[in-house]
Swiss-Prot record:
It comes from Bos taurus (Bovine). This is Autophagy-related protein 13. The LIR motif (LC3-interacting region) is required for the interaction with the ATG8 family proteins GABARAP, GABARAPL, GABARAPL2, and MAP1LC3A. Autophagy factor required for autophagosome formation and mitophagy. Target of the TOR kinase signaling pathway that regulates autophagy through the control of the phosphorylation status of ATG13 and ULK1, and the regulation of the ATG13-ULK1-RB1CC1 complex. Through its regulation of ULK1 activity, plays a role in the regulation of the kinase activity of mTORC1 and cell proliferation. Residues 254-323, 368-403 are annotated as: Disordered. GO terms for molecular function: protein kinase regulator activity.
């Protein structure tokens, strides 16, 4: 398509579309991992991440997305699709949803590539983060395990909606206008999941042949394999590592820098692995799928949320006698204790919470009951205007005890006040204005009396003004 873009704007636009497609795949797949993702923001962004979002990339997902794109970009007539499906342990599968990134011919030639397109793609990616967690597949992904797993497949071409069955619904995430076309991101998802309980899943032909090593050339190059989002069989070895994110993607080196910070790298067995809640593992499987996440099914479990019944700061591992496959992740959930810090007391009483830093005090807890700082002595009862206003004359003797229980009177002693300076004492001023007197203007009798007095004195005031009328005229002449 012929446009008026210069070479630099065209290069930036292609780069934005490329990395938006890669980040779209990351967001969709990470939303189907079955775990909550928590990322930390940073006040010092760099150019290693994109679209003002700290999305930690899974290297294998990025690798598969680049293989599916094969150097192409979503354009008019070329769509990138991410298919999410479900597969049981018996081999039955069912498509759940299909995410489509496409472009139409409607152009916006007035928009600026370097700022407007980039910021709108960032907003579209944030919308995708929210919408991926409201479709039915998200709830299924949170319950995946030994009975079924969630798979993903990336392909480039026409959208295939036949596997969604009848009555599927579509939702449009959003659109972004560019000088070469309008980018559209949409989703079609299955809503009829009632037949899942009867295990009557739709049979689909194998997408690829059975491969022992998935790095060998596939017998069907035109097909794309399915990848479990969050599953690993027992006894698998993670001997093959994917290229790291830093090696597989470029740095945002445009004329501006509004990208989130770079990822922290932790040395692993065979190279740097990005530290994050979605740690991938790469392994070969005996059927047509390959593995893409970190959660093993041999009992190893990583606590994801503090609301779980287990301790949210430790990693529970049921396998004994061997190292955990995600030892790197333990640094995220284990509380780090600094040097020269005593172990906190497990049982902390309520009285110890009244004093700041009570757990570091050298005294014993049993002496706190006699401490006047913890349990101050009872102050004598005092009478104040506020207390008198609270106990009205109409209150009966039976309700006076209940009122005293509800209102606790405290003798107000302001700081830095002196008793000998009564007119300037802040406490006296405060007590006087707690119960201010009624305004005289609000009383009808007093108002009527004052008005009558004013009317009686009116003739005298008029006579005084008539007597001094010459003085008033002379004063007016001096003003002229």
């Amino acid at each position: 398509m012929e446009t008026d873009l210069n070479s630099q704007d065209r290069k930036d636009l292609d780069k934005f579309i490329k990395f938006f497609a890669l980040k779209t795949v990351q967001v969709i797949v990470q939303a189907r991992l079955g775990e909550k993702i928590c990322t930390r923001s940073s006040s010092s962004p760099t150019g290693s991440d994109w679209f003002n979002l700290a999305i930690k990339d899974i290297p294998e997902v990025t690798h598969e997305a680049k293989k599916a794109l094969a150097g192409q970009l979503p354009a008019v007539g070329r769509s990138m699709c991410v298919e999410i499906s479900l597969k049981t342990s018996e081999g039955d599968s069912m498509e759940l949803e299909i995410w489509c990134l496409e472009m139409n011919e409607k152009c916006d030639k007035e928009i600026k590539v370097s700022y407007a397109v980039y910021n709108r793609l960032s907003l579209l990616l944030k919308s995708l983060l929210a919408i991926t967690r409201v479709t039915p597949a998200y709830r299924l992904s949170r319950k995946q395990g030994h009975e079924y797993v969630i798979l993903y497949r990336i392909y480039f071409g026409d959208v295939q909606l036949n596997g969604l069955g009848e009555g599927f619904q579509t939702v449009r995430v959003g659109t972004v206008g560019t000088p070469v076309g309008t980018i559209t991101l949409s989703c079609a998802y299955r809503i009829n999941l009632a037949f899942m309980s009867t295990r009557h899943f739709e049979r689909t032909p194998p997408i690829m042949g059975i491969i022992i090593d998935h790095f060998v050339d596939r017998p069907y190059p035109s097909s794309s394999p399915m990848h479990p989002c969050n599953y690993r069989t027992a006894g698998e070895d993670t001997g093959v590592a994917c290229p790291s994110v830093e090696d597989s993607q470029e740095v945002c080196a445009t004329s501006f820098s509004t990208s989130p910070p770079s990822q922290l790298m932790v040395p692993g067995k065979e190279g740097g692995v990005p530290l994050g809640p979605s740690q991938p593992a790469h392994a070969a499987q005996a059927d047509q799928e390959r593995l893409a996440t970190y959660t093993p099914s041999d009992g190893a479990h990583c606590a994801a949320t503090p609301s779980s019944s287990e301790d949210a700061e430790t990693v529970s591992n049921s396998s004994e006698g061997r190292a955990s496959p995600h030892d790197v992740l333990e640094t995220i959930f284990v509380r780090k204790v600094g040097a020269f810090v005593n172990k906190p007391i497990n049982q902390v009483t309520l009285t110890s919470l009244d004093i700041p830093f009570a757990m570091f005090a050298p005294k014993n807890l049993e002496l706190e009951d006699a401490d006047p700082m913890v349990n101050p002595p009872d102050s004598p009862e005092t009478t104040s205007p506020l207390q008198g206003s609270l106990h009205s004359d109409g209150s009966s003797g039976g309700s006076s005890g209940h009122t005293q229980d509800d209102f606790v009177m405290i003798d107000f002693k302001p700081a830095f006040s002196k008793d000998d300076i009564l007119p300037m004492d802040l406490g006296t001023f405060y007590r006087e204005f707690q119960n201010p007197p009624q305004l005289s203007s609000l009383s009808l009798d007093i108002g009527a009396q004052s008005m009558a007095e004013d009317l009686d004195s009116l003739p005298e005031k008029l006579a005084a003004h008539e007597k001094n009328v010459r003085e008033f005229d002379a004063f007016v002449e001096t003003l002229q």
